[in-house]
Amino acid sequence: MSDPVIKRALVSVSDKTGIVDFCRELSELGVEIFSTGGTLKTLQDAGIAAASISTITGFPEIMDGRVKTLHPKIHGGLLAVRENANHVKQAADNGISFIDLVVVNLYPFEATVAKPNVSFEDAIENIDIGGPSMLRSAAKNNESVTVVTDSADYALVLQEMRANNGATTRATRLHLALKVFELTSRYDRAIATYLAGKVSAAEAAASTMSVQLAKELDMRYGENPHQNAGLYRLTDSNGTRSFEEFFEKLHGKELSYNNMLDIAAATSLIEEFRGEEPTVVIIKHTNPCGVAQASSLVDAWHRAFSTDTQAPFGGIVAFNRPLDMAAAQAVNEIFTEILIAPAFEDGVLELLMKKKDRRLVVQKKALPQSGWEFKSTPFGMLVQERDSKIVAKEDLKVVTKRQPTEAEIADLMFAWKICKHIKSNTILYVKNRQTYGVGAGQMSRVDSSKIARWKASEVNLDLHGSVVASDAFFPFADGLLAAAEAGVTAVIQPGGSIRDNEVIEAADANNLAMVFTGMRHFKH
């Protein structure tokens, strides 16, 4: 089958970018143009010969434009197989003329529902019915019909028509058809996502879950140079999230895959301290290696850095308030890969930009704390709710004879916020709202405790008077006894071990105050 010459075009677009110039050139190539509503007016106002779709259907647009192209003379003209003699005869018998080119983009549903306080009625009116129907009909019959949904493809179509006596190539028609089904799939998912937000979680729950991924950024590589990688916008039942919605890179080379993981880790942790005293978080390989609060950012930085004076080199630092000059000068004394803050005060950017390899990132708004987490495995996708439930001071259950002091409670709460952001098994020592020793990612909780104590001793931090947090219960008393030996005075842990009584007795024997949260924070 030879490539069909484009003689008739149906044009109906919401996004009118480039449509006048495109249709003017189509007209100059001898293409007969039919159009609808606002598009028809735009073309006619520009002096382009275009006829109403009603001249094909013999039926007016009705119901405020809801019904205009849903007609056999439209879809017959799109779906007829030109090489099928029976189709050709039926088309002729019913006064159906072939349509060779469809130029349609859809009502801006996603842009509409993204507006603040959009009404349900406005959202519903922006669900396109006729547009997707025409696109799908044209795309199905891509052997004969060229279908364009993206103004970026106008030039390609014109180029091929000029080079091929008014026809497009089979390869191009197939490529454009693929874009149609990608578009309509994404469009329907956006509608379903919006409607899911209008019903209760129980009503919306289903045995299947759909997500959409649209590439936002190409990464230089993945975790390692031999791995390809990219960052994709994600749309699920909680809406669409993208990097650019929450962050803006102000300086530095492009962000890597590992950078993105570290940014997610750093900002998820700093969110725990939104609105609190000046707080600094230092991240290395997604684990916090230093976290501290103080009366100023510069003091918080020095305290966080003192937890581990080696790991912060090449690390990621997040601040819970605008980065001021004093803190910037202190941080600038070492090389850090990424600095993240809600803003940078006057003069700070000029100072920090002198290091070309450093990335400076503004966090524009708070990250969502609820929603789903997705983890890919070779055998399927694991889905879980985010670990976003909060343990308040009132939720703590004191299980020992000694009650914790107010100062101990403050440190226990500080430690618990950090604990859930560290890879399991986690043991964390905190003193005066500063991490003193971080034991992360060990197969044995006792080993995590030993590492945390060793890290503190390496930088001469005295654990006497500190508190300890464990992301899961102590299965035996040995971990707690090791903490007591280090000088800990209070303990926070989920509880729930069959040996809780044994652990509580050990705490009482060492005059420790211990609280249970009733909530575990494993992080794999």
UniProtKB/Swiss-Prot annotation:
GO biological process: one example: 'de novo' IMP biosynthetic process
InterPro entries: AICAR_Tfase_dup_dom_sf, Cytidine_deaminase-like, MGS-like_dom, MGS-like_dom_sf, PurH-like
Keyword Transmembrane belongs to the record: no
Known catalytic reactions: (6R)-10-formyltetrahydrofolate + 5-amino-1-(5-phospho-beta-D-ribosyl)imidazole-4-carboxamide = 5-formamido-1-(5-phospho-D-ribosyl)imidazole-4-carboxamide + (6S)-5,6,7,8-tetrahydrofolate; IMP + H2O = 5-formamido-1-(5-phospho-D-ribosyl)imidazole-4-carboxamide
Keywords: Hydrolase, Multifunctional enzyme, Purine biosynthesis, Transferase
Gene Ontology molecular function: IMP cyclohydrolase activity; phosphoribosylaminoimidazolecarboxamide formyltransferase activity
Domain of life: Bacteria
Enzyme Commission number(s): 2.1.2.3, 3.5.4.10
UniProt keyword Transferase, yes or no: yes
UniProt xrefs under NCBIfam families: PRK00881.1 (NF002049), purH (TIGR00355)
HAMAP family recorded: PurH (MF_00139)
Family as reported in the entry's similarity comment: Belongs to the PurH family.
Protein name listed in UniProt: Bifunctional purine biosynthesis protein PurH
Gene: purH
